[in-house]
Amino acid sequence: VKIEIITNLNDNLKETGFGPFQACENVKQSLLRIDHSAIVTVCNNLSDLDGVVKRKPDIVVLAVKYVVIESGEFIWLSDFFDKHNISFTGSTRETLQYDSNKILGKERVSAKNIPTGKYFTTIPNQYKHAEELPLAFPLFLKPSDSANGNGIDTMSLVHEFSEYKTKVSTLYEEYMQPILVEEYLEGLEFTVSIIESGGRLIAIPIEIIPPKEDGIRILGSKVKTENSEILSRIFDSKTLRMILEIAEKSFKALGIRDFGRIDIKMDKQGNCKFMEANLVPGLKKGSSYFPRACKIAADIKYDELICLMIQGAIDRSQ
């Protein structure tokens, strides 16, 4: 099969997709090993994308969701290739919005009666006193559409109004968008890699254990960059069942196609809640959660994983 992996090297993208260029190279090498023809194409403008259409690949593997062209316009790759009748990996534009906008994702999942952590959104000076806040402290603050733990650090967990105001201002200054404020869930943290294969879901859950800093565990950009978190299989059968049920229901509720990663957190009573969906998960060999989870919890090797991830697009191209 003739395949092009489409990426973008724009550092301004808040959402990193498969990850650095090396991740796309990892995917390419994997495709070559399983006897496909594969190249990585960096698309920075419309003429780059038109070039892909002219080459007529059988499928395109979308390593990012969109390309920002010179005019500042967003070209959503799923829409672009759909319009040109080229089969692409992953979800449609309609579904990808639930990843790009974490609030939309939470609303959709919650509307389907899937357990979801309580939250609200805010901008600076929207609330003048602690009593006005929709939720009680402690609270957890983060950007509403950023990936890879960006904007998340030890200051994200706030216990009083002065800390809350400071973090809201800091995040708003950097991201210029409403801030997502969540009830703080102090229990364990999980992520579930899900692959659609032959009409069934292969769901692979793992626990993520960030290192303790100032007595708390926070999975922020520093931890993710340093790879200092531990990934572990889940051995408690009750927890495992709960996580799998939430992850699979969320996958279906959001209309995810081919693959996706569902993040789940536990509260102190042991109840699990949907946190967010990642529909273009990192694929850097050796460090990204998606391939690591597959290896740790299901012994699915990298090449086998890539093969499973692209099969839906191959089927649709025929």
Regions found by a protein language model. Give the residues of each.
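Flexible, glycine/charged-enriched surface loops at secondary-structure junctions
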Residues: L180-E182, R257-R261
